[in-house]
């Protein structure tokens, strides 16, 4: 059986951080420190150097790929003699809880929107497509929140298929991390973006991951370019615990927070609680459902200590 390294060598071009940084060429840095501060996630130390070395080359690559897709579309339309509706280029970002998917998505949204070829870039998280809390309780899935079966896949696929078909207006449900539930009286309006970034735990899943006898489309069927943010599990668990401690003194202190009871834990209790949540929910979900989809990504961002990217793998 081939090792993981052999598989990566066969499928991907590997770039060390310094090698990848050289591919930026002359792409300017358009973010400043205050703007970057607004994009950072909890407990992340993302710097302008990280943006310059990792995200600017990625922004350049994606701009070239999107441009090639747009040109191909023009050629095809001329050949067919038609003018179809505007279809956004769809980028997915997958990875574990606490790996920094949301920050990666926000940074790419900010950078890609600076290119004149595709100024309108929308970002949607799959959190809004989780079943409402009452439905999760009814199905006995509250302790499996984040697992594939906890998502309303019919709604999610309907949303992304409408986007792919060029629908001029599509609504995405929103999620509240305070109430730990879908927001019922508001939504996100998506109106013909040039690029749509969709970020979530399971966006790389395919029919291979479905139960036997299940036939349904998946998000990955509609995605043009996929990114997986990767890190070793011991780092992910540490980052999750660190983030839990940050939330305990921040978001959890809100009396309206679903997790307000955690705000009363001392350091030792909080670390034990977070570790137990990881070991019983997030860790198993990573091993069973998320990590097995990694090598389907077009690009893998590998993180080391302090959330810094150490290597980039680009599919051949």
UniProtKB/Swiss-Prot annotation:
InterPro entries in the cross-refs: P-loop_NTPase (IPR027417), PanK (IPR004566), PRK/URK (IPR006083)
Keyword Amino-acid biosynthesis: no
Presence of the UniProt keyword ATP-binding in the record: yes
GO biological process: coenzyme A biosynthetic process
EC number in record: 2.7.1.33
GO molecular function: ATP binding; pantothenate kinase activity
Catalytic activity as recorded in UniProt: (R)-pantothenate + ATP = (R)-4'-phosphopantothenate + ADP + H(+)
Protein name: Pantothenate kinase
């Amino acid at each position: 059986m081939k090792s993981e390294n052999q598989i990566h060598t066969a499928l991907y071009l590997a770039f060390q951080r310094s090698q990848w940084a050289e591919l930026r060429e002359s792409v300017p840095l358009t973010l400043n420190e205050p703007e970057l501060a607004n994009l950072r996630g909890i407990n992340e130390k993302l710097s302008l150097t990280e943006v310059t070395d990792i995200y600017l080359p990625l922004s350049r690559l994606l701009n070239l790929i999107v441009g090639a897709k747009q040109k191909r579309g023009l050629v095809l339309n001329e050949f067919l003699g038609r003018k179809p509706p505007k279809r956004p280029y769809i980028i997915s970002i997958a990875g574990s809880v606490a790996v920094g998917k949301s920050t990666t998505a926000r940074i790419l949204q900010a950078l890609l929107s600076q290119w004149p070829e595709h100024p309108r870039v929308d970002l949607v998280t799959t959190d809004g497509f989780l079943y409402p809390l009452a439905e999760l309780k009814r199905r006995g899935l509250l302790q499996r929140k984040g697992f594939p079966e906890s998502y309303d896949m019919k709604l999610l696929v309907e949303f992304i298929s409408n986007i792919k078909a060029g629908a001029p207006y599509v609504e995405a449900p929103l999620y509240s991390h305070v109430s730990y539930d879908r927001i019922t009286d508001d939504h996100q309006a998506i109106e013909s973006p040039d690029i749509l970034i969709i970020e979530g735990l399971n966006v790389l899943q395919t029919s291979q991951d479905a139960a036997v006898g299940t036939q349904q489309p998946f998000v990955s069927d509609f995605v043009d370019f996929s990114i997986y943010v990767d890190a070793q599990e011991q780092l992910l668990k540490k980052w999750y615990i660190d983030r839990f401690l940050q939330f305990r003194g921040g978001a959890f202190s809100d009396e309206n927070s679903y997790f307000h009871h955690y705000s009363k834990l001392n350091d030792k209790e909080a670390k034990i609680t977070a570790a137990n949540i990881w070991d019983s929910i997030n860790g198993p979900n990573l091993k069973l459902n998320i990590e097995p989809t990694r090598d389907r990504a077009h690009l893998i961002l590998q993180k080391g200590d302090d959330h810094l990217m150490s290597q980039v793998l680009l599919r051949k």
